[in-house]
Every structure is written in C-alpha cells, then in structure tokens.
Amino acid sequence: MIATPLWNLHVPSRLKSWFDTVTVAGKTFRYTETGSEGLINNKKLLHIQANGGVFHGQDPASQYIKTIFGFLGIKDCSELFVEGMDHDPENSESIVAAGIEKAKELGKTF
C-alpha cells in the first residue's frame, strides 16, 4: 500500500527516492533478451492519493506510481483518489469521509 499526497503534480521527493532505491536490476527486475522483466510477482498494490484538485487518476504522479510498480512486476493495482478538497473546500469534510468509506470497502478485498 502506498498512501501519498499529490505535490505539484508529482509524488513527494522521499517516495521518489524510495523508488530509486528499490528499483534494482537483479533484485526487483531483470534484463532479458526481449527487455526488462519485473521480479515482484503475485503481489497487490493499493495506491491511495489525496489531491487538492480533481484529476480522476490522470495526474502524472498516479501514472508514475502505476508505471513503476508495473515495471517491477506488480500488475494487480487498485487506486483510491480522495480529491477536490482545495477545489471545493466547503465540502472537504464530506470528501474525506467518502474517501474513508471507499477505503473500508477496498480493505475488505485487499
């Protein structure tokens, strides 16, 4: 599970640094004659992201996370976007409450 805010359309620098640390040839992926192959198989990813705006999963950060984990071999990815708190601050509490309910539902199958 990865839970992150959206900062300036990307992941926080500490998370980027962690990705750089764990993306290691021979450990988490390998090179083959036909290209790279992820070595982390049979794992799931749940990506939870808080956004001030509304992007519907099309922001660069969520695409980056999905791409990195796919490269490492994790194909079973679920996403939960709790978004719009800055766009609609009057409804931020209900946006967060709805996100918590969605997280509870996702947690039943994760």
Where are these regions (language model features)?
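Helix-loop-strand module that forms the ligand-binding subsite of alpha/beta enzymes
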Residues: 2-63
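Glycine-rich phosphate/pyrophosphate-binding loop and the adjoining helix
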Residues: 57-110
